[in-house]
Design a protein with these regions (language model features):
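N-terminal amphipathic alpha-helix/helix-capping segment at the start of soluble metabolic enzymes
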Residues: 1-12
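Short helix-capping segments at alpha-helix termini
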Residues: 4, 57-60, 105
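Non-catalytic positions within long, well-ordered alpha-helices that form the structural scaffold/packing
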Residues: 24-27, 79-80
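Glycine-rich, positively charged N-terminal anion/phosphate-binding segment
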Residues: 43-53
Length: 152
């Protein structure tokens, strides 16, 4: 339906099966399921993520778990329990923790970055442990949402 060239779009903040079905009609294959450990709207419990992960795979969609603000051992446990194939972690973990996630799960790992936590040296260090970077124009802080444009 749409031709995005080499850009892979991801629709984030999915909270129900009906949204998955609509997304599938628009030829977008990547969907973001946001853990309630993160700040912001449209977050899901681990049980809800597990249910939507199964529904996503049934619809031939690629769900991505967005997670952070918890210890890496708990991230590993959730990734394995949910049986998700890709996880996007917040940019708070050290390279050793990312290596642990890489070694203890079968999931591809991506990392969320934004204009406030852009550290080129860190990105060079973790490059062998992740599959992609996601650049976020919205920063969720406990009770605040800060938005930027690409121009900014």
């Amino acid at each position: 339906m749409f031709n995005y060239g080499n850009i892979q779009l991801k629709v984030c903040g999915i909270t129900d099966q009906k949204s998955l079905e609509v997304i599938q009609k628009y030829s977008v294959s990547r969907v973001g399921l946001v853990s309630d450990y993160l700040y912001g709207p449209n977050t899901l419990s681990t049980k809800e993520i597990q249910e939507l992960t199964i529904a996503s795979y049934n619809l031939k969609l690629n769900p991505i778990l967005l997670i952070g603000n918890i210890q890496m051992q708990e991230v590993i446990s959730i990734v394995n329990d949910v049986a998700i194939k890709e996880v996007c972690i917040s940019n708070q973990y050290k390279n050793e923790e990312i290596e642990l996630l890489n070694n203890k799960t079968d999931a591809k790992i991506s990392i969320s970055v934004n204009y406030e936590n852009f550290d080129y040296n860190f990105f060079e260090e973790i490059l062998n442990n992740i599959s992609s970077f996601y650049y976020d124009l919205i920063i969720y802080i406990k009770d605040t949402i800060e938005k930027k444009s690409l121009v900014e």
